[in-house]
Swiss-Prot record:
Pfam families the UniProt entry points to: Adenylsucc_synt
Keyword Magnesium: yes
Species per Swiss-Prot/TrEMBL record: Coprinopsis cinerea (strain Okayama-7 / 130 / ATCC MYA-4618 / FGSC 9003) (Inky cap fungus)
Protein name per Swiss-Prot or TrEMBL: Adenylosuccinate synthetase
Highest taxon, organism lineage: Eukaryota
Keywords: Cytoplasm, GTP-binding, Ligase, Magnesium, Metal-binding, Nucleotide-binding, Purine biosynthesis
CDD domains on file: AdSS
Subcellular location per the Swiss-Prot or TrEMBL entry: Cytoplasm
Amino acid sequence: MSVSVVLGSQWGDEGKGKLVDILAGDIDVCARCAGGNNAGHTIVVPIDGVEKSFAFHLLPSGLVNPKCTGLLGNGVVIHLPSFFAELDALESQGLDCTNRLFISDRAQLVFDFHQIVDGLKEVELGGSSIGTTKKGIGPAYSGKASRSGLRVHHLFEPETFAAKFRKVVEGRFKRYGHFEYDTEGEIERYRKLAERLRPYVVDSVAFIHKALASGKRVLVEGANALMLDIDFGTYPFVTSSSTSIGGVCTGLGIPPKMVGKTIGVVKAYTTRVGAGPFPTEQLNDVGVHLQEVGHEYGTTTGRRRRCGWLDLAVMKHSCLINGYDAFNLTKLDVLDGLDEIKVGVSYSLDGKELSSFPADLELLSRVEVNYVTLPGWKTPITEIRNYDDLPANCKKYINFIEEQLKVPIEWIGVGPGRDAMITKRKDQ
């Protein structure tokens, strides 16, 4: 049995959660392999006949299916107070997660001091700040890389945990000065949290391989997106983990040969949050239209997202690394009101077309985007559920993307509702 994967193909916020929610109806395990509570999305589902909105940040959104088990793998970093706050919020809305949510004993822990340090680092960087969510994700991964981080299993060795915790905090004091922090109070708080956490902790490698060996269907929900990957994104304006297909293997302990269908989620235009080059960004009426009609505000931070045309130079780079088998094109309805739609197909620098995506951001900031202009459809598509019923120009836009990327689009999002998703057959 192989693992299916859903990955963000741009700079995040593509709408991965909605597809995961739909696919979760046919899966047994939904796993996360990277990131922390720095990502976020909202899913609207009917519970007992009433539509309810659930906000996910850290927990796998497949939990909306009551028959699905959620797993946070070893590649995830976990802030326990946020974990329990999110879990309590979901359960208070009627989503029972009893005996169907598990955490890897190898996962790294995020502490409040990581969040404080995250803010201090941004202040230190000043005008060069990356624009993090200040959730402590970067400092936690930094501790992991320097082998000073604490993992979930350390919580169950109280004396060892306390000694390691004091040492790590003291190291942060030496680096950033003595900021206000109750070290002993935190040790006591985590002693109590450890007991509450104990029933959720498993050896995630054994867990997922046992599930696969028994024929269970596993779906991996990627966090963030390819252009935020620590290696392949617009470094340093990236997150601190591997958000590419490679992170699926390292973040869950599964071999590449077990990775099956890989689905890329791509927004019909482009957005990003925070600083960094954005070649197709539209600082004009088009950008305002995309932002307002698309409700482009972050679930985690509430920040306005920067908006621009679809960038196929980004997508070609993304395809090379993740090897998508299919796409879910999302928020296509946001383009309904536009007379014409531009698509960036390549970059030129100093008059020469580039053959690959630049690693050097100084070069990326100077590129000229080569656009193709397509006609708009000027017709609302939110109520359409059959591909054949889409306007002709809308189908031309979809076909153009497929032809350029040589990957089929199997799902098309045409609105925020759970049912606002068109399934496209290969012969259409």
